[in-house]
Design a protein with these regions (language model features):
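Intracellular juxtamembrane helix-capping segments at the cytosolic ends
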Residues: 113-126, 299-313
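Cytoplasmic helix-loop-helix junction between adjacent transmembrane helices
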Residues: 105-140
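Conserved MFS/SLC helix-loop-helix module at the cytosolic interface between two early adjacent transmembrane helices
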Residues: 59-92, 258-264
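Pair of pore-lining "gating" transmembrane helices in MFS-fold secondary transporters
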Residues: 6-34, 197-216, 291
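Short amphipathic helix-loop junctions that connect adjacent transmembrane helices
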Residues: 31-44, 218-234
Length: 371
């Protein structure tokens, strides 16, 4: 096998490991706010549980990255997939905030390892990195896009906990993909001491998480909750599944476009278009701009990892990928809190226009810093 073919195979297996584990998390995002009583928590506690996996990643991503690099993909992903299955079983059998909180923290670290593996293996060979990573994002999204509507329908008949027993078995199937991964360690850079200011890619990652994973997703649910008929859980599950379906269909296309035209150029172009769509979303063109944002987000997903790999070759690549993920998690954690505070009291146009302009500025700064 050529090095490119091996990289394609390893990236696919890593993506399948994450794709079979991820439904545990996305179903909890769908069901916990609606059925928090069934899980033995208040709505406020449900919000903390949903944020806990991101908060622990902000603190623990560096530790995960060092252990991932030291032990290699196979041990890291086997442990992470096993942890995902444990978390799913716990969601099915346990109730109460203090019993569910450790599961969310464990899942946060497990996701960090799986996500880092998909990015590192997707960019390990520079040739075709954007195409390879875009294809791996499609494999990752396959699990959630199937699990969300199935889980919504099962919940209506069997309650919100039964689906997690099914997802435990699905996650365990991910062990087969994880076993096929390489076990060789990755080179580790020297540990840096002291505070490092965010660079242009950090800033873009933060704003991307803030706008698209935070303000937009919460706004889509908050503003569109009365615009579609049918049961609330089915409608919400359909909306969330559409987001992942967009990744399946469009992320490979975005990767091929990045290989052809350059990931930095595509980053600027798509970010500017996203900024325009966000302004329209906040100004009243709700469904048309929401659809455009879903498309643009899916096209953008394969861009950042190849840019990071190109700018940070060698031992620093894994830590650089982890740093970008931390900043995106910070933005995605701040975004829902901002949306919850501002949407009931502030004009929609301003809520989305200001972050849109900042996102466009950050994308342009990424290209300028590369020169």
């Amino acid at each position: 096998m050529t090095s490119t073919a091996v990289a394609d195979r390893d990236a696919r297996n890593s993506a399948l490991s994450l794709g079979l584990s991820l439904p545990v998390d996305v179903l909890l995002y769908l069901l916990l706010p609606m059925y928090h009583d069934a899980f033995g928590v208040t709505l406020a506690e449900a919000g903390v549980l949903l944020a806990a996996n991101r908060l622990v990643r902000i603190v623990g991503y560096g530790w995960v990255a060092r252990n991932y690099a030291r032990h290699g993909d196979r041990p890291a992903c086997l442990c992470a997939v096993g942890a995902a299955a444990l978390c799913s079983l716990g969601c099915a059998l346990l109730s109460g905030f203090w019993l569910l909180l450790p599961l969310r923290l464990i899942w946060g670290l497990a996701f960090a390892a799986l996500n880092l593996s998909t990015q590192a293996l997707g960019t390990i060979v520079p040739e075709g990195a954007a195409r390879r990573y875009g294809r791996s994002r499609a494999y990752i999204a396959l699990g959630p896009v199937l699990a969300l509507p199935l889980g919504a329908v099962m919940t209506q008949y069997f309650g919100p906990k039964a689906i997690f027993l099914v997802l435990t078995l699905v996650a365990l199937a991910g062990l087969l993909a994880a076993r096929a991964l390489p076990s060789s360690p990755h080179p580790q850079p020297a540990r840096r001491k002291g505070l490092r200011l965010p660079n242009s890619l950090d800033t873009w990652s933060f704003l991307e998480g803030l706008t698209l994973d935070g303000l937009f997703i919460v706004g889509l649910s908050y503003l569109g909750r009365d615009m579609m008929p049918g049961g609330a859980v089915v409608v919400a599950g359909t909306l969330m599944a559409m987001r992942y379906l967009g990744e399946i269909l469009l992320s490979p296309i975005g990767g091929r476009m990045a290989d052809r035209f350059g990931p930095e150029q595509m980053l600027v172009c798509l970010s500017l278009m996203t900024a325009v769509a966000l302004v329209g979303f906040g100004s009243g063109w709700f469904w048309s701009c929401a659809a455009a944002i879903v498309v643009l987000r899916s096209l953008q997903i394969p861009l950042l990892a190849p840019i990071v790999a190109r700018r940070t070759p060698g031992p620093g690549r894994v830590q650089a990928l982890a740093a970008r993920a931390i900043w995106r998690d910070i933005g995605a954690g701040v975004g829902p809190m901002l949306a919850g505070a501002l949407l009931p009291v502030a004009p929609q146009a301003w809520i989305y226009a200001v972050p849109a302009l900042l996102l466009a500025w950050a994308a342009i700064a990424c290209v300028r810093s590369a020169r």
